[in-house]
């Protein structure tokens, strides 16, 4: 899980979603998991 100020899609499988006001990136590649905070 990478925590960054701005989350970006890395590949075409990445999806940007909001959970409880937190912006997250979920992907089939676990290295691409990110959250904003």
Swiss-Prot record:
Keywords carried by this UniProt record: Ribonucleoprotein, Ribosomal protein
A GO biological-process term: translation
Signal sequence extent: none
GO MF term set: structural constituent of ribosome
Record carries keyword Ribosomal protein: yes
An annotated GO cellular component: ribonucleoprotein complex
Magnesium is among the record's keywords: no
Superkingdom of origin: Bacteria
Protein family per UniProt: Belongs to the bacterial ribosomal protein bL36 family.
The protein's name: Large ribosomal subunit protein bL36
High-level lineage: Bacteria, Pseudomonadati, Pseudomonadota, Betaproteobacteria, Burkholderiales
Gene designation: rpmJ
């Amino acid at each position: 899980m990478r925590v960054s100020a701005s989350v970006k899609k890395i590949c075409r499988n990445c999806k940007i979603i909001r959970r409880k006001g937190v912006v997250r990136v979920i992907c089939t590649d676990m290295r691409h998991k990110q959250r904003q905070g």
